[in-house]
Amino acid sequence: MKKFITLITIMLFTTLIGLCGCAGDYRKTVTSIEAMTLTLQGLRGTSVYEIAEVNETTELRRFRKVYSKGEDILELEASATCDTKDFIELMNNCSVIRWDGFHGEHPKNVKDGIMFDFTATVNGGQTIYADGSANYPKGYNEFVRELNKMLAECEEN
Protein backbone atom coordinates (compact mmCIF):
# COMPACT_ATOMS: atom_id res chain seq x y z
CA MET A 1 0.00 0.00 0.00
CA LYS A 2 2.86 2.37 0.85
CA LYS A 3 4.45 1.74 -2.56
CA PHE A 4 1.12 2.46 -4.26
CA ILE A 5 0.74 5.83 -2.49
CA THR A 6 4.35 6.71 -3.35
CA LEU A 7 3.75 5.79 -6.99
CA ILE A 8 0.55 7.89 -7.18
CA THR A 9 2.33 10.83 -5.52
CA ILE A 10 5.21 10.65 -8.01
CA MET A 11 2.81 10.44 -10.96
CA LEU A 12 0.78 13.40 -9.69
CA PHE A 13 3.91 15.48 -9.08
CA THR A 14 5.29 14.65 -12.54
CA THR A 15 1.99 15.58 -14.18
CA LEU A 16 1.83 18.92 -12.37
CA ILE A 17 5.42 19.77 -13.34
CA GLY A 18 4.65 18.86 -16.95
CA LEU A 19 1.56 21.07 -17.01
CA CYS A 20 3.50 24.01 -15.61
CA GLY A 21 6.15 23.53 -18.27
CA CYS A 22 3.56 23.52 -21.04
CA ALA A 23 1.93 26.70 -19.82
CA GLY A 24 5.25 28.51 -19.51
CA ASP A 25 6.17 28.41 -23.19
CA TYR A 26 3.07 27.82 -25.27
CA ARG A 27 4.54 28.85 -28.62
CA LYS A 28 7.17 26.39 -29.73
CA THR A 29 6.66 27.19 -33.40
CA VAL A 30 6.60 30.26 -35.58
CA THR A 31 3.11 30.93 -36.95
CA SER A 32 3.74 34.39 -38.40
CA ILE A 33 6.74 36.61 -39.04
CA GLU A 34 6.78 40.37 -38.88
CA ALA A 35 10.51 41.13 -39.14
CA MET A 36 13.92 39.47 -39.17
CA THR A 37 17.51 40.69 -39.31
CA LEU A 38 20.58 38.47 -39.33
CA THR A 39 24.00 40.13 -39.32
CA LEU A 40 27.14 38.11 -40.05
CA GLN A 41 30.50 39.74 -39.43
CA GLY A 42 33.85 38.19 -40.22
CA LEU A 43 37.23 38.94 -41.74
CA ARG A 44 35.73 39.10 -45.23
CA GLY A 45 33.27 41.79 -44.23
CA THR A 46 29.72 42.12 -42.99
CA SER A 47 26.53 40.75 -44.54
CA VAL A 48 23.04 41.67 -43.37
CA TYR A 49 19.99 39.54 -44.20
CA GLU A 50 16.58 41.14 -43.80
CA ILE A 51 13.05 40.17 -44.66
CA ALA A 52 10.11 42.35 -45.61
CA GLU A 53 6.58 41.07 -46.02
CA VAL A 54 4.96 42.06 -49.31
CA ASN A 55 1.32 40.93 -49.61
CA GLU A 56 1.35 37.13 -49.21
CA THR A 57 5.06 36.82 -49.96
CA THR A 58 8.26 37.49 -48.09
CA GLU A 59 11.13 39.36 -49.69
CA LEU A 60 14.55 38.24 -48.52
CA ARG A 61 17.38 40.71 -49.01
CA ARG A 62 21.12 40.41 -48.42
CA PHE A 63 23.13 43.58 -48.00
CA ARG A 64 26.90 44.02 -47.91
CA LYS A 65 28.36 46.65 -45.59
CA VAL A 66 30.82 48.88 -47.45
CA TYR A 67 32.75 51.95 -46.45
CA SER A 68 32.01 54.90 -48.74
CA LYS A 69 32.51 58.64 -48.38
CA GLY A 70 33.51 58.38 -44.75
CA GLU A 71 30.68 56.15 -43.55
CA ASP A 72 29.45 52.58 -43.52
CA ILE A 73 26.54 51.95 -45.88
CA LEU A 74 24.56 48.86 -46.80
CA GLU A 75 24.50 47.97 -50.49
CA LEU A 76 21.89 45.54 -51.74
CA GLU A 77 23.73 42.43 -52.90
CA ALA A 78 20.85 40.05 -53.66
CA SER A 79 17.11 39.66 -53.13
CA ALA A 80 14.54 36.92 -53.56
CA THR A 81 10.80 36.64 -53.17
CA CYS A 82 9.48 33.55 -51.44
CA ASP A 83 6.17 32.32 -50.09
CA THR A 84 5.70 33.44 -46.48
CA LYS A 85 4.45 29.98 -45.47
CA ASP A 86 7.64 28.42 -46.89
CA PHE A 87 9.79 30.90 -44.97
CA ILE A 88 7.94 30.13 -41.74
CA GLU A 89 8.40 26.42 -42.43
CA LEU A 90 12.17 27.00 -42.83
CA MET A 91 12.26 28.83 -39.50
CA ASN A 92 10.42 25.96 -37.80
CA ASN A 93 12.58 23.27 -39.44
CA CYS A 94 15.66 25.05 -38.07
CA SER A 95 14.06 25.54 -34.60
CA VAL A 96 14.64 29.30 -34.78
CA ILE A 97 12.15 30.00 -31.98
CA ARG A 98 14.38 28.01 -29.60
CA TRP A 99 17.33 30.30 -30.36
CA ASP A 100 15.87 33.01 -28.13
CA GLY A 101 18.37 33.93 -25.44
CA PHE A 102 21.25 32.03 -27.06
CA HIS A 103 24.64 33.66 -26.50
CA GLY A 104 27.48 31.69 -28.06
CA GLU A 105 30.74 32.55 -26.34
CA HIS A 106 33.77 32.50 -28.62
CA PRO A 107 35.49 29.12 -28.15
CA LYS A 108 38.86 29.13 -26.45
CA ASN A 109 41.83 28.71 -28.82
CA VAL A 110 39.75 29.64 -31.90
CA LYS A 111 41.60 32.49 -33.59
CA ASP A 112 38.92 33.59 -36.05
CA GLY A 113 35.31 32.94 -36.90
CA ILE A 114 32.09 34.62 -37.85
CA MET A 115 30.07 36.63 -35.36
CA PHE A 116 26.31 36.67 -35.75
CA ASP A 117 23.48 38.76 -34.37
CA PHE A 118 19.89 37.58 -34.95
CA THR A 119 16.65 39.39 -34.17
CA ALA A 120 13.17 38.39 -35.28
CA THR A 121 9.65 39.44 -34.39
CA VAL A 122 7.23 36.55 -34.79
CA ASN A 123 3.78 35.39 -33.69
CA GLY A 124 2.34 38.89 -33.41
CA GLY A 125 5.04 40.50 -31.28
CA GLN A 126 7.22 37.76 -29.76
CA THR A 127 10.90 38.70 -30.08
CA ILE A 128 13.67 36.18 -30.69
CA TYR A 129 17.22 37.35 -30.03
CA ALA A 130 20.44 35.36 -30.36
CA ASP A 131 24.10 36.16 -30.89
CA GLY A 132 27.45 34.43 -30.89
CA SER A 133 30.97 34.26 -32.17
CA ALA A 134 32.06 31.03 -33.88
CA ASN A 135 29.44 29.33 -31.70
CA TYR A 136 25.92 28.89 -33.07
CA PRO A 137 22.54 27.48 -31.99
CA LYS A 138 21.23 24.20 -33.35
CA GLY A 139 19.85 24.68 -36.87
CA TYR A 140 21.79 27.91 -37.51
CA ASN A 141 24.07 26.57 -40.28
CA GLU A 142 21.13 24.99 -42.12
CA PHE A 143 19.15 28.25 -41.82
CA VAL A 144 21.95 30.40 -43.30
CA ARG A 145 22.62 27.80 -46.02
CA GLU A 146 18.92 27.87 -47.03
CA LEU A 147 18.85 31.70 -47.07
CA ASN A 148 21.84 31.70 -49.43
CA LYS A 149 20.25 28.97 -51.54
CA MET A 150 17.05 31.04 -51.95
CA LEU A 151 19.09 34.05 -53.04
CA ALA A 152 21.24 32.00 -55.45
CA GLU A 153 18.19 30.39 -57.08
CA CYS A 154 16.67 33.80 -57.66
CA GLU A 155 19.90 35.11 -59.23
CA GLU A 156 19.93 32.16 -61.67
CA ASN A 157 16.45 33.02 -62.97
Predicted features by range, described:
Residues Q41-K69:
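Post-signal-peptide N-terminal segment of Sec-exported extracytoplasmic proteins
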